Swiss-Prot record:
Subunit structure: Part of the 50S ribosomal subunit.
Gene: rplX
SUPFAM superfamilies recorded: Translation proteins SH3-like domain
Protein name listed in UniProt: Large ribosomal subunit protein uL24
UniProtKB keywords: Ribonucleoprotein, Ribosomal protein, RNA-binding, rRNA-binding
InterPro entries reported in the protein's UniProt record: KOW (IPR005824), Rib_uL2_dom2 (IPR014722), Ribosomal_uL24 (IPR003256), Ribosomal_uL24_CS (IPR005825), Ribosomal_uL24_KOW (IPR041988), Translation_prot_SH3-like_sf (IPR008991)
Family per similarity comment: Belongs to the universal ribosomal protein uL24 family.
GO BP terms, alphabetized: translation
Length: 109
C-alpha cells in the first residue's frame, strides 16, 4: 500500500475533531504515513497486558498511546490557537511552506 500524503508532521500541535478524545489537544509523537495514522502524546491511551521479558522484567499492565486516524485530527494554528485546515504556499526562494487558512499565517518556520 502506498504511503498517504499527511497534512501534519511530528511535533505539530493538533486537536482531535472526532472520536472519544474529541476536543483534546496534544503534540504528535509519531506519524505513520503507510497506515494514514498519527500517535498523539497522552491521547488515545490503551492498556496492554504484557508478559515479563528482557526489556520489561516485571510485566503487567502497560499504558501506551495508540494511533489515531490522521483524518480525525486538525492542526492547531500557533497564531490564532484554533484548529484549522492548511494550504501550501511556494515562497520566492522556491521552498514550500504550510499556512493557516483561517488567519493566513505561515505555520512552518
Amino acid at each position: 500500500m502506498a504511503a498517504k500524503k499527511m497534512h501534519v508532521k511530528k511535533d505539530d500541535m493538533v486537536m482531535v475533531i472526532a472520536g472519544k478524545e474529541k476536543g483534546k489537544t496534544g503534540k504528535i509523537m509519531r506519524v505513520l504515513p503507510g497506515k494514514g495514522r498519527v500517535v498523539v502524546e497522552n491521547l488515545n491511551v490503551v492498556k496492554r497486558h504484557t508478559r515479563p521479558n528482557r526489556v520489561n522484567t516485571q510485566g503487567g499492565i502497560v499504558e501506551k498511546e495508540a494511533p489515531l486516524d490522521a483524518s480525525n485530527v486538525a492542526l492547531v494554528c500557533s497564531a490564532c490557537n484554533k484548529p484549522t485546515r492548511t494550504g501550501v504556499r511556494v515562497l520566492e526562494d522556491g521552498t514550500k511552506t504550510r499556512f493557516c487558512k483561517k488567519c493566513n499565517e505561515t505555520l512552518d518556520k
